[in-house]
Design a protein with these regions (language model features):
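N-terminal helical cap/lid subdomain that shapes the substrate entry/recognition surface
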Residues: 2-117, 130
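Conserved phosphate-coupling serine/threonine residues in phosphotransfer and NTP-handling enzymes
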Residues: 12, 138-140
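Conserved hydrophobic beta-strand within the GNAT/NAT acetyltransferase core sheet
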Residues: 134-136, 193
Length: 253
């Protein structure tokens, strides 16, 4: 029986392409601002590709789709070291800049977030009608994730914030599943992880949770079907999926 659900945020609850996909280009422009104008576009294209962004497509196994800010910064730092070592900042300084620039694009400049279903109503239904605990497991920071949930008026239903602030394990470390389960006084096997990337599914399995993939983000069916325990098109189908699971359980009884 499912008693708790961890949601990935980007690509699962909100549209990854419309939020993060549109932010990547402007952020890279600012990070490469000190490079010669004539080569900047070439460097930008190559850097985006190293992050797993190929024109309008985003590789679900690429850095941009699932890595933490620190890991993304490592990719950018190594790229700058290779191409323009004379412009290379301290890694911690670059990390701060990467975080700040993305925060400007995906938080400060936004007044709303494109979603796949009304998140507040989904969380309300899960909490009040299904008696399920709701949490987030995201590689985004707490400040960014909280602002997003506040904007969607859904923060009040979130009782576990698995964010990347340097104090908690990050996906795919299954210890984060264990921490969520402990905080909810349930077993990891009673927890459902909902996400849009193969990394989300590996994370679920590492923590002994059920891995439910959604096809609304970067992971397409050929990426997800071999790693997910089950698949749905988007979180809009989650209540019906849960009803189906309840029916299966009652049928066995």
């Amino acid at each position: 029986m499912i008693k708790g659900i961890l949601f990935d945020k980007d690509g699962t609850l909100i549209d990854f392409y419309k939020v993060w996909g549109t932010a990547a280009g402007p952020v890279m422009d600012r990070l490469l601002a000190d490079c010669h104008t004539g080569e900047r576009e070439f460097l930008k294209k190559e850097l985006l590709e190293r992050l797993g962004i190929h024109d309008s497509e985003i590789d679900p196994e690429g850095a941009f789709a699932w890595m933490t800010y620190r890991e993304i910064t490592d990719v950018i730092w190594n790229f700058l070291k290779e191409k323009h070592p004379e412009l290379l900042p301290e890694k911690q300084e670059l990390l701060g800049k990467v975080q700040n620039e993305f925060y400007k694009e995906v938080v400060e400049k936004r007044r709303d977030y494109p979603v796949f279903t009304e998140v507040k109503e989904l969380f309300r239904k899960l909490t009040e009608e299904y008696g399920v605990k709701v949490g987030l497991a995201t590689t985004d920071t707490y400040a960014s994730a909280r602002t997003c949930m506040d904007c969607l008026d859904a923060s009040g239903y979130v009782t576990f914030w698995g964010t990347d602030d340097g104090t908690l394990p990050v996906k795919p470390d299954g210890k984060l599943v264990e921490l969520a389960a402990e905080s909810w006084y349930i077993k990891p096997e009673e927890l459902l992880m909902v996400g849009d990337t193969p990394n989300d599914m590996r994370f679920a399995h590492n923590g002994h949770a059920f891995a439910l993939g959604v096809l609304s983000g970067t992971g397409k069916i050929h990426h997800m079907e071999c790693v997910a325990d089950d698949l749905i098109e988007s979180v809009a189908e989650l209540p019906a999926w849960l009803e189906g699971k309840r029916g299966e359980k009652n049928g066995r009884n």
